[in-house]
Amino acid sequence: MPIRIPDQLPASDVLRTENIFVMSESRAASQEIRPLRVLILNLMPKKIETETQFLRLLSNSPLQVNVELLRIDNRPSKNTPTEHLDTFYRQFEMVKGKNFDGLIITGAPLGLVQFEDVIYWDHLKTIMEWAKHHVTSTLYVCWAAQAGLKLLYNLPKKTRKEKLSGVYHHKIHHQYHPLLRGFDDTFLAPHSRYADFSPEFLEEHTDLDILATSDVAGTYLATTKDKRNVFVTGHPEYDSHTLHNEYIRDLGEGMEPAIPINYYPNNNPDNPPCASWRSHGHLLFSNWLNYCVYQQTPYDLDHFSEDAFTKDD
């Protein structure tokens, strides 16, 4: 099934060249079906690149998804044209009266910044609190996962001494959990973060189901019992060259970044990297849309009620 996005969104041309079924708003308006409504709060600096990555994953589903893009505030962006933000992004005031089937909160390059020093921290807290009453399932990615754990469980910020960067092996737990349907016993996924997500720490201080872990990277995938809050500590949405671009950026800024682990052939940055996590990323998002969103959400979003959700699978 298609993904529905605004007719002139730049990502539409990219996705169509990849033979991804993108439906224009005008065509979708003539269909008499109940599409899912998903809101993406894009916290990454390069908005167009990030929105394209997430739309690519959302498109690989038999469900029609109507996507709205949300910006955290109206500050000018150094990496995204103002015209693009004004045309395709909503302010929170424009959506807070609505209900959504799903919310995705992206990562942000704030790994070494204390939460209270994040300029939009109070506004982010407002949005996350709003989501409890207006969104069926929220997917927190990388830095957003750490922020969500702070707000939902009051967990302190834990930071690694060295940045975790590369593609890591993970193993699954709770094999028959809906989010893991179709997963291999082990899989690869990229990480790019300072945050530390120890499985033992999460088990001690939360009631989360920890679904996938790495001996090196720690917790990768966890969810609340009712599947309304899903935490992904890595970047399954990343393109094959995203880690490379970050590595080159850090080199250019005079830093001494380690070469991303298990990423370049022969561990040589001169060799073009290959994405070894693409199928995992598509399956994860398909499962989230199907089992956490579609099969949980009310048909009539105007009758959204927290009481409708149970904590059992």
Swiss-Prot record:
One of its GO terms (cellular component) is cytoplasm. The record marks G111 as: Important for acyl-CoA specificity. Keywords: Acyltransferase, Amino-acid biosynthesis, Cytoplasm, Methionine biosynthesis, Transferase. Pathway: Amino-acid biosynthesis; L-methionine biosynthesis via de novo pathway; O-succinyl-L-homoserine from L-homoserine: step 1/1. It comes from the Bacteria. Signal peptide: none annotated. Gene3D superfamilies: 3.40.50.880. GO terms for biological process: L-methionine biosynthetic process from homoserine via O-succinyl-L-homoserine and cystathionine. The keyword Transferase applies. InterPro entries: Class_I_gatase-like, HST_MetA, MetA_family. SUPFAM superfamilies: Class I glutamine amidotransferase-like (SSF52317). CDD domains: GATase1_HTS (cd03131). It catalyses: L-homoserine + succinyl-CoA = O-succinyl-L-homoserine + CoA. It holds the Pfam family HTS. GO terms for molecular function: homoserine O-acetyltransferase activity; homoserine O-succinyltransferase activity. Its main location: cytoplasm. Substrate binds at K163, S192, R249. The active site is at C142, H235, E237. Its EC number is 2.3.1.46. The record marks S192 as: Important for substrate specificity. It is an enzyme of class 2 (transferase). It is found in: Cytoplasm. Belongs to the MetA family. This is Homoserine O-succinyltransferase. It comes from Vibrio campbellii (strain ATCC BAA-1116).
